[in-house]
Amino acid sequence: MAASVTVIGIDPGSQCTGWGIVREASGVLTLVNCGAIRPKGADFAARLGDLYRQLADVVRAHTPDEAAVEDVHAAQNVATALKLGQARGVVVAACAAHGVPVIDYRPSVIKKALVGTGRAEKEQVGYMVGQVLGVRPDWKLDTGDALAAAICHLNQRRLTRLAGLA
């Protein structure tokens, strides 16, 4: 078993992608860094390219061991769902290109792991992330969701180890 593991949690979006790096060492979770990417570009393809470049920079800077990525959930309409899916694909590609394994989590699973209900609001998730990491949440809601994904994954890893499945 590794002495520590670093996970990047990512909440993909075509307009704002939240990311958060959490490290677990000896059962203690620590916030390493977090932020939000608001891709720029003249058109959607250019924004996806910018999202890739910015996220790749984050991955290179922090060298996470694994990535926990929020899966696509129900969107307002088909066009929104397609754009979200494309942004998520860019996120997965940026991680994979840097050798970071990607684990997918449904939003309801992440929310339930942090708040106790799969229908929690973003504000509730952000509050619980702050409680778990011992910090005051002053980040964007998408960043809180990304940190929640990382925490959810680290908890899942711990449970898998305890159950003797890993």
UniProtKB/Swiss-Prot annotation:
UniProt xrefs under HAMAP family: RuvC
Keyword Transmembrane: no
Lineage, opening ranks: Bacteria, Pseudomonadati, Thermodesulfobacteriota, Desulfovibrionia, Desulfovibrionales
Domain of life: Bacteria
Active site per UniProt: D11, E70, D142
Protein name, as recorded: Crossover junction endodeoxyribonuclease RuvC
Enzyme kind, highest EC tier: hydrolase
Pfam family, one: RuvC
Enzyme Commission code(s) on record: 3.1.21.10
Major site of localization recorded for this protein: cytoplasm
Binding of Mg(2+) 1, residues: D11, D142
Protein role: The RuvA-RuvB-RuvC complex processes Holliday junction (HJ) DNA during genetic recombination and DNA repair. Endonuclease that resolves HJ intermediates. Cleaves cruciform DNA by making single-stranded nicks across the HJ at symmetrical positions within the homologous arms, yielding a 5'-phosphate and a 3'-hydroxyl group; requires a central core of homology in the junction. The consensus cleavage sequence is 5'-(A/T)TT(C/G)-3'. Cleavage occurs on the 3'-side of the TT dinucleotide at the point of strand exchange.
Family stated for the protein in its record: Belongs to the RuvC family.
Subcellular location(s) per record: Cytoplasm
Reported cofactor(s): Mg(2+)
UniProt-listed InterPro entries: RNaseH-like_sf, RNaseH_sf, X-over_junc_endoDNase_RuvC
Self-association state and partner proteins as the record states: Homodimer which binds Holliday junction (HJ) DNA. The HJ becomes 2-fold symmetrical on binding to RuvC with unstacked arms; it has a different conformation from HJ DNA in complex with RuvA. In the full resolvosome a probable DNA-RuvA(4)-RuvB(12)-RuvC(2) complex forms which resolves the HJ.
Keyword presence, Flavoprotein: no
Entry's Gene Ontology BP terms: DNA recombination; DNA repair
Disulfide bonds: none
Any one GO molecular function term: DNA binding
Binding sites annotated in the UniProt record for Mg(2+) 2: E70
Cofactor binding, per record: Binds 2 Mg(2+) ion per subunit.
